[in-house]
Amino acid sequence: MRAVFPGRFQPFHLGHLAVIEWLLSKYDELIIVVGSGKDSHTIYNPFTAGERILMIKKGLKEFNVDFTRVIFFPIMDSFTSGLWIRNLELYSPKFDVVVSGNPLVISDAREAGYIVDLPPMFNREMYNATKIRKLMLENNESWSELVPKSVYSFIKEIKGDERLRDIARNDY
C-alpha cells in the first residue's frame, strides 16, 4: 500500500523523522507532500518548498532511512473543503491511505473515500516546529537538539535562522 503524509515541515524535525520511520515500517511506499508549497520567507513558513524537501532528504539520509521508497513533492494550500484532496489526487501518484492528524485533512480524506491513519505523536511537546521557530527567533541554539544534525547544518548553511529573525524584525 502507498500512504501519503502531508506536512509543512517548517522545519523538518526529529518528530517528523519518527513518524516517517513508523510509516515506512507499515507501508510499501510513502508520499511526503510538502504543504504550503508556494509560501516562504514568513515567520510561519520561513523555508521554501525546495529547502524543506532537501531538509527531509538530508535527515532521512543521516538516519539511514531508505528513501528509495519515498516520493517527495510540494503542493499549494487550498482552503476550500474538499478541494485540497482533489488537488492532491491531480498531482500525486495514486495512494491508498492518508496519514494526518489535521482535522480538515482527515475530514476531506474520509469524504473522498480514503483510509485515514492517525500517526502517533512522538513527544509532540518537544518536537514541534512552532517551538523550534520560536527558539530560532530567540537566537536560542537549543533548537539544534530537536532536528537532525544534517538539518541543523543545512539551516545554518542557508542562514535560515538568520532569515527568520530578519523577517521578524519590525522597523516601525
Swiss-Prot record:
GO biological process terms, semicolon-separated: NAD biosynthetic process
GO molecular function: ATP binding; nicotinamide-nucleotide adenylyltransferase activity
Keyword annotations: ATP-binding, Cytoplasm, NAD, Nucleotide-binding, Nucleotidyltransferase, Pyridine nucleotide biosynthesis, Transferase
Keyword Membrane belongs to the record: no
Enzyme Commission number(s): 2.7.7.1
Record's keyword annotation contains Nucleotide-binding: yes
Bridged cysteine pairs (disulfide): none
Organism domain of life: Archaea
UniProt xrefs under SUPFAM superfamilies: Nucleotidylyl transferase
Catalytic activity: beta-nicotinamide D-ribonucleotide + ATP + H(+) = diphosphate + NAD(+)
EC category: transferase
NCBIfam families from the UniProt entry: arch_NMN_Atrans, cyt_tran_rel, PRK01153.1
Pfam families: CTP_transf_like
GO cellular component, one term: cytoplasm
UniProt family annotation: Belongs to the archaeal NMN adenylyltransferase family.
Subcellular location: Cytoplasm
Protein's pathway: Cofactor biosynthesis; NAD(+) biosynthesis; NAD(+) from nicotinamide D-ribonucleotide: step 1/1
Name assigned to this protein: Nicotinamide-nucleotide adenylyltransferase
Primary residence: cytoplasm
